[in-house]
Structure formats: C-alpha cells, structure tokens
Amino acid sequence: MKELLTPEALLTNLKDVRALTRKVIEAFPEKDLFEVNIANLRPFSAMVEEFLRVMDYLFKERFQEQHTLFLEGAFPTTKTEVLALWDRATEILDREWTKVGDYTQPLTIYQMTFSFAQWILYFIENESHHRGQGYTYLRALGIEPPFFWARESFN
C-alpha cells in the first residue's frame, strides 16, 4: 500500500503550520503578546510556550536531545526572545528530522502513546487550534491576522 502521508510531506505540513504561527506571534504588539486574553483564556505567549514545551518534549524523547529549549519558569519575556526560541526549535527539527527512522514507532508523551507520525499530527492540530485563539486576540486588538491558508509550501 502506498503511503498516504510521507515523512517529507508531514515535515512540510508541520513547517507550514509553524511558519504561520510565527507570523501570528510577529503580528502581536510586544505587550499584548504577553498580557491580552479574552474570557480568562491564556495570553497567546502562554500558548506559544505550550507549543514549544511539547516540541521540546518530543526532542528529548525521540531525538535524544541532551538539552531543553528553556528551563521551567524561564520562558522568554520579550517577543524577540520568543521568536529566537521559535527559530531554534525549527533548526533542531530540521536537523533531527532525518534521524527519526520508523515513523510508525510508538512514542509515549504525557502518558499517551501514539506513533511519531500521529504525534506530529497532534502537534499540528493543537497548534492550529490555539493559533485560532491568537487570531481572535489579534482581531480584538484591531489587527488583521495572517491568512490562515497562507502556507509557504503553497507558493
């Protein structure tokens, strides 16, 4: 049976999602990235921290990274630092992706076991969901968010 989603296509999709989320981070004014929330939801920076923590956990579990992207309680406090950390995570992803090997191999994260490919799909859905919250915050601030369909690989 032919693969429905190749590792290369999965990486392209993940990187498209991450690039779009980066544009949303960039669209926020500095202060609002860390402070604005609606209906007691987290500020967008806290959602970005979640994306990076999950990615960091993946790096440690699957890629055997010997470091963490940031220490507990030490998430960046400026947009410039957040974007630099985001880019560092992307560099690690690019460097380590070819080392994954078997994308069907099970991986347990947060007491849930899925294949590596399923975890990447989970990350994509989780990030897309929370990015939608970021879009709502931007619109509430009177800022037009990036087009949700504007993926780099579509060019």
Listing of model-derived features with the role each one plays in the protein:
Residues 11-15, 19-22, 30-72, 111-155:
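Short, contiguous alpha-helical
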Residues 1-14:
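Extreme N-terminal tail/first-helix region
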Residues 76-109, 114-137:
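Acidic/histidine-rich alpha-helical segments that form the ligand environment
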Residues 6, 104-105, 144:
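Alpha-helical membrane-embedding segments
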